[in-house]
């Protein structure tokens, strides 16, 4: 006879459903340790079965060290917004961001083999979470920053839909440096720059843009002598759209980001330099399969 106490203990240890726990205990004649093994085996099988499903929902999470000198941003995907709001999923994503900040891993493959806790790797812990919550999940990507002189700052928008990580360098500690990092996070989240500066833009791409603008201007009947000026004007506009330092500050449309930083550098009494930034948007680039609900129900009923 399997006791309710044994079922409860097994549920607490594994997170599996009540009936699954009862079946596992029945199979193992009430041996909890063996039942844990059975559930792990079944959980792994369930996780493998789910791994083919599209995981385009989820969360972007960040973590900043106490000294504000390092930080990380991660994207953890699942299949539905329902699971993305689950407390266990959120806690896993938070823990993942913290681990990513201090890890020596440089790829997702290396990261998931890091220790999640004293008993499991990140991949093993994720597999257990997949088994408990019943959806495919993937650690999609992560980036970590660290700076000796300056700060690393992050911002999360829309409950984990968009995340930003920024590294700002300065030789002095000043509230102005923190303010720059904070405002840049907001700017990047809102304006979505693709590059830090004009120098980072691929020149082959610029030449292609110039040729497109040149042909457009000629097709509009513009005189050749002013076409080049028009092309350069459009290229400058392109820079202002895609380069962070060239963008107009979202809080003051009369001021560029570069001018804002220069003003804050005067307050700090030292140059402030933006070293790098990254912006994650949940699910970007993942093709989500839209299923017909009626067809899905019929499929599950075997019709």
Swiss-Prot record:
One of its GO terms (cellular component) is cytoplasm. Gene3D superfamilies: 1.10.286.20, DNA helicase RuvA subunit, C-terminal domain (1.10.8.10), Elongation factor Ts, dimerisation domain (3.30.479.20). PROSITE patterns: EF_TS_1, EF_TS_2. The keyword Iron-sulfur does not apply. It is found in: Cytoplasm. One of its GO terms (molecular function) is translation elongation factor activity. Keywords: Cytoplasm, Elongation factor, Protein biosynthesis. SUPFAM superfamilies: Elongation factor Ts (EF-Ts), dimerisation domain, UBA-like. It comes from the Bacteria. Residues 80-83 are annotated as: Involved in Mg(2+) ion dislocation from EF-Tu. Belongs to the EF-Ts family. PANTHER family: ELONGATION FACTOR TS, ELONGATION FACTOR TS, MITOCHONDRIAL. Associates with the EF-Tu.GDP complex and induces the exchange of GDP to GTP. It remains bound to the aminoacyl-tRNA.EF-Tu.GTP complex up to the GTP hydrolysis stage on the ribosome. This is Elongation factor Ts. It comes from Clostridium botulinum (strain Eklund 17B / Type B). The lineage of its organism: Bacteria, Bacillati, Bacillota, Clostridia, Eubacteriales. The gene is tsf.
């Amino acid at each position: 006879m399997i006791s309710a106490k044994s079922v409860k203990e097994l549920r607490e240890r594994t997170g599996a459903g009540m009936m699954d726990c009862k079946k596992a205990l029945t199979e193992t004649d009430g041996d909890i340790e063996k039942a844990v093994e059975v559930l792990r085996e079944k959980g792994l099988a369930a996780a493998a079965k789910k791994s083919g499903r599209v995981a385009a929902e989820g969360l972007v999470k960040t973590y900043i060290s106490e000294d504000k000198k390092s930080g990380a941003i991660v994207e953890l995907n699942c299949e539905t917004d329902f699971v993305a709001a689950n407390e266990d999923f959120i806690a896993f994503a938070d823990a993942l961001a913290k681990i990513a900040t201090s890890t020596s891993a440089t790829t997702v493959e290396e990261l998931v083999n890091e220790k999640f806790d004293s008993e499991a790797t990140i991949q093993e812990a994720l597999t257990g979470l997949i088994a408990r919550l019943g959806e495919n999940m993937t650690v999609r990507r992560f980036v970590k920053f660290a700076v000796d002189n300056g700060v690393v700052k992050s911002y999360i928008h829309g409950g984990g839909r968009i995340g930003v990580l920024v590294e700002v360098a300065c030789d002095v500690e000043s509230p102005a440096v923190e303010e720059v990092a904070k405002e840049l996070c907001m700017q990047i989240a809102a304006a979505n720059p693709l590059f830090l500066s004009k120098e980072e833009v691929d020149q082959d791409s610029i030449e292609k843009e110039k040729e497109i603008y040149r042909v457009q201007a000629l097709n509009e009947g513009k005189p050749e002598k002013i076409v080049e000026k028009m092309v350069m004007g459009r290229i400058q506009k392109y820079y202002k759209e895609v380069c962070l330092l060239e963008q107009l500050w979202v809080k003051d449309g009369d001021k560029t980001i570069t001018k804002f930083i220069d003003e804050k550098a005067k307050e700090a009494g030292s140059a402030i330099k933006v070293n790098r930034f990254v912006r994650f948007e949940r699910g970007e680039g993942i093709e989500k399969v839209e299923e017909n609900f009626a067809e899905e129900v019929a499929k599950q009923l075997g019709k």
